[in-house]
Amino acid sequence: GLFGVLAKVASHVVPAIAEHFQA
């Protein structure tokens, strides 16, 4: 469902943001 898609997107977006803040 929509929540599954949202969770999948978040699981990609969150690490990307974390890399930007750590780099």
From Swiss-Prot:
Shows antibacterial activity against S.aureus and S.uberis. One of its GO terms (biological process) is defense response to bacterium. The keyword Iron does not apply. This is Maculatin-1.2. Expressed by the skin dorsal glands. Its main location: secreted. The modification Alanine amide is found at residue 23. Disulfide bonds: none annotated. One of its GO terms (cellular component) is extracellular region. The keyword Hydrolase does not apply. Keywords: Amidation, Amphibian defense peptide, Antibiotic, Antimicrobial, Secreted. It comes from Ranoidea genimaculata (Brown-spotted tree frog). It is found in: Secreted.
